[in-house]
């Protein structure tokens, strides 16, 4: 339809024109955003139906090396008032005004919108955030991360946040995008090991994580999980183990969220071991290539949480 065409073309056409016709020395993102306000007014007069994500609120999280996980809200619309709620209610012109990044404390149901002169500019952004024991914590894994997960800063560069990537940023992945999932090419018989230093003895009784199903892209969800604790980061004791079963759809991809609960235990170091979801058949489960007939499925993991 013409409306769909408008949505796909605008304001992309303006961005293409800006990058193609402007000298590199003169390119200015802030100035471009300021001029886009007038462009959208012109498009409205022309009865064009552009994509209006320009007016939406983007939800980012970021942790400095030793700091807590912070929530950052931004809109490309210049000088917009960002109003937000943390209880799942719809934001209004009288909701809390966003003035600076704030610490993520506990699980919140964040909703935010940009306002101008008391009027909501476009849609409400909805993003649950999970302020668990691991939120904002650096971690180590025993595999090289492929898809690195998180984005941060004005250029949204993949993997720019070196402390959290996609595993401890407080945001769970979903079916809509591969961001902020983190991928691991699993070797048969070798589990993924994720380790976090909690810095002090901490009571833990539950671990939650997500994994992705999409065999066409060589992904199967986790087949099992085990939890180990340590006081010194050297000697670990397993305190829980669980086999995982999932009902797969006929086609497409789906995100699964799994949890494992156990008797409260003290941990200074927490290790989560995630097992591969199994094997895939070359040319049957995914497009045929010159590789082996049977391969271990990749693990795509997001937001490992502890409570």
Residue ranges and their predicted role:
Residues 1-41:
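Conserved alpha/beta catalytic core and glycan-binding cleft of carbohydrate-active enzymes
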Residues 13, 120-122, 282-288:
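Beta-sandwich strand segments
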Residues 13, 84, 112, 207, ...:
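Hydrophobic, well-ordered secondary-structure elements that form the walls
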Residues 27-193, 212:
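Short, compositionally stereotyped local motifs that mark structural "simplifiers"
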Residues 129-131, 243, 256:
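Substrate/cofactor-recognition hotspot
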Residues 174-240, 254-307:
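Aromatic, loop-rich ligand-recognition surfaces of beta-strand-rich domains
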Residues 238-248:
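Solvent-exposed serine/threonine-rich low-complexity stretches and specific carbohydrate-binding patches
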């Amino acid at each position: 339809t013409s409306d769909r065409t408008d949505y796909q073309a605008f304001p992309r056409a303006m961005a293409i024109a800006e990058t193609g016709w402007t000298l590199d020395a003169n390119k200015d993102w802030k100035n471009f955003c300021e001029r886009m306000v007038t462009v959208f007014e012109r498009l409205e007069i022309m009865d064009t139906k552009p994509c209006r994500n320009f007016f939406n609120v983007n939800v980012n999280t970021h942790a400095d090396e030793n700091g807590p996980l912070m929530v950052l809200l931004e809109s490309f619309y210049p000088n917009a008032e960002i109003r937000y709620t943390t209880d799942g209610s719809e934001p209004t012109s009288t909701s809390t005004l966003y003035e600076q990044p704030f610490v993520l404390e506990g699980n919140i149901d964040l909703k935010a919108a940009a306002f101008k002169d008391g009027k909501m500019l476009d849609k409400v952004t909805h993003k649950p955030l999970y302020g668990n024991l691991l939120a904002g914590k650096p971690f180590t894994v025993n595999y090289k991360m492929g898809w690195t997960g998180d984005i941060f800063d004005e250029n949204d560069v993949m993997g720019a946040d070196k402390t959290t990537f996609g595993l401890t940023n407080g945001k769970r992945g979903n079916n809509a995008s591969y961001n902020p999932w983190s991928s691991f090419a699993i070797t048969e018989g070798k589990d993924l090991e994720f380790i976090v230093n909690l810095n002090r003895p901490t009571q833990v009784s539950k671990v939650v994580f997500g994994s992705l199903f999409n065999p066409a892209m060589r992904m199967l969800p986790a087949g099992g999980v085990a939890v180990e604790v340590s006081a010194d980061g050297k000697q670990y004791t397993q305190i829980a183990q669980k086999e995982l079963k999932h009902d797969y759809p006929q086609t497409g991809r789906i995100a699964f969220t799994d949890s494992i609960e156990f008797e409260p235990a003290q941990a200074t170091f927490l290790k989560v071991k995630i097992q591969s979801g199994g094997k895939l058949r070359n040319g049957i489960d995914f497009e045929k290539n010159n590789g082996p007939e049977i391969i271990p499925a990749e693990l795509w993991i997001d937001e490992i949480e502890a409570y």
